[in-house]
Amino acid sequence: MLQPKRRKYRKEQKGRNTGIATRGNAVSFGEFGLKAIGRGRLTARQIEAARRAMTRHIKRGGRIWIRIFPDKPISHKPAEVRMGNGKGNPEYYVAEIQPGKMLYEMDGVTEELAREAFRLAAAKLPLKTTFIVRQLGA
């Protein structure tokens, strides 16, 4: 699963996920893309599950790019532990997603195959997404 190799600090504050994606919002590598319309968090497990769904569908053909990386640690306190006594330990990592962010890209396959692969991947994600075709000259 995806997670940072090392971090300067183990824990991070919650923060607020606001605004729209101004970077990483265009198809840059492939011909087709899966773009987020909604806002939220994607865990490393969700990113991997969607990648597997796409890879299985396109079989040997094509190439997939993952345009997001889970770099924010989410901490949890153990069950039945009293309040206080500091912050919990990091349990998993998430990627904060703003509307307009490109999540995955694909190349080397037909549009129908890419559309179906992205539909299967989108079913694994807790966000609303849309299918994007690269525009010429963009």
Swiss-Prot record:
Residues 1-13 have a biased composition (Basic residues). Pfam families: Ribosomal_L16 (PF00252). Residues 1-20 are annotated as: Disordered. One of its GO terms (cellular component) is cytosolic large ribosomal subunit. InterPro entries: Ribosomal_uL16, Ribosomal_uL16_bact-type, Ribosomal_uL16_CS, Ribosomal_uL16_dom, Ribosomal_uL16_sf. GO terms for biological process: translation. Keywords: Ribonucleoprotein, Ribosomal protein, RNA-binding, rRNA-binding, tRNA-binding. It comes from the Bacteria. GO terms for molecular function: rRNA binding; structural constituent of ribosome; tRNA binding. PROSITE patterns: RIBOSOMAL_L16_1. Part of the 50S ribosomal subunit. Belongs to the universal ribosomal protein uL16 family. PANTHER family: 50S/60S RIBOSOMAL PROTEIN L16, LARGE RIBOSOMAL SUBUNIT PROTEIN UL16M. Binds 23S rRNA and is also seen to make contacts with the A and possibly P site tRNAs. This is Large ribosomal subunit protein uL16. The gene is rplP.
